[in-house]
Amino acid sequence: MSATSQNCWPSVEFDIGAINNFLKRFFPAGFYYKTFMWPKSFWYKVYEPFIRKAAGLGVASLEKDKERYEHKFEYCDLLVTGSGPSGLASAYAAAKNGAKVILAEDKPRYGGTLLTDDVSIDNMSGKDWSEKIISELKTMPNVTLKNRSQVFGYYDHNMMVMFERVGDHLSNKSKYTPRQRLWYIRAKETILSTGSIERPIVFGNNDTPGVVLSSAAKEYMKVYGVLVGRKPIIFTNNDSAYETAFEFKKNNVEPIILDTREEHDSEVVQEAKNKGIQIKFSYGVIVANGYKKVKSAKIGKLTKDKKSFESTETINCDCICVSGFWTPTVHLASQSGNKLKFDEKIDAFIPDKSKQNEKTIGAANGSFTLQETIESGFKTGSELSSKITDKNNENKIPTVTETKYSVHDKFWCMPLPKNENPKRFVDFQNDVAVSDIEIALREGYRSIEHVKRYTTLGMATDQGRTSNLNGLQMVSNIENKIVPEVGHTTFRPPFTPITIGTIVGREVGICLLYTSPSPRD
């Protein structure tokens, strides 16, 4: 593989373009609409090349792609997207009823959050239980297991499109082994067990290297054995991030927890105190300090209304693990034609009424306890498969032991002290800051779709997975509207970026356009 850095000159270590950090007031959202207007002759020869280069996008290779790509068509009774607890339970229940099942998992390993959460299922760890279910599914001839496979599009008549990474991870592979494969799957029924995505809390300089999602830090430690820092701050508005602090403690690292909520005694708080972990209630990170990486953080004790600070201080740290609660992954449900509704309990959108033969379950449907997700998986898998096979084998619901979490804090963005104005990024991929959203609303944009296009909020390749809800909350606060009145933007396929080679498949070279020889030839 040949890799080159982009959007930097002459190097990442010393980037001349970083001077824009000091000129940020001159580059707000939509500045190019007002700046590059005259002369007209400069539009295509000067202004457009400048803007495109400044956008930081990669350059497509001019070399011929020597890899092999394939397309495949498949049919099944039930397609299950995601192999977390609800996905495994639904696939297992459906397979027991004799249905032809395809289980698709984006990551190399099956299990989802069971690989990282400290839970017990039938006196087994979550990881062991998931491995047991997978080993049983592998023995069933009516089950197809596909890891490294992302279902990225939901189209009419229950047609799903899946992107499989076949050979990317293989060091030695046959020349006939494709790099990637595109699947067109027609399913009689579809279960969307796509889980949820942790969202950040917005604060100053939150794009500094060393700022990570709390769940990512935990997964690095538990799955890959990697510490993201040795002086971590856990900045959270909910209980789930405490599990990351516990994992740091297991690895002989002393974390500090900043909890935006007032002092309370939930199970995880008591456990943290018993472990000797320092907790600061009603605190949050105001600004991350550091140029190439986080070196310290300015933190503050929030007032009752959370609009200012009682006191501030600076503490040393080398990483900030952030958790602003969880957002159900509703992209595929929305693509299917399902209209979303706002759930005030979790402050997020969830699927409403199905338009096609699909059911959304588990965390993707706003159920965040393990007991609920497993029960919904067994129930939905059994019900949908029994309609197809006329069989209804009884499933024993496993006994689950898990930590009970208390209510999260409805708090998404840290205020700033007077005379301080660091960038507070909402969309990390498109560099959309709080100030950009404020400008869009100040200039008369009211529809969330217009705000999206003016600021490019949620228009990057991640489609705003971590930014959309924070952006909606900010628009609702500024406009004095509730989030359902603001609405949400449209989710479109592909859910994740895919290569052009996968889309094209074998239709390359002379196969791209059929040439019919004439009689003369």
Q: How does the language model describe each region?
A:
Residues M1-A18, R25-D521:
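Residues forming the flavin
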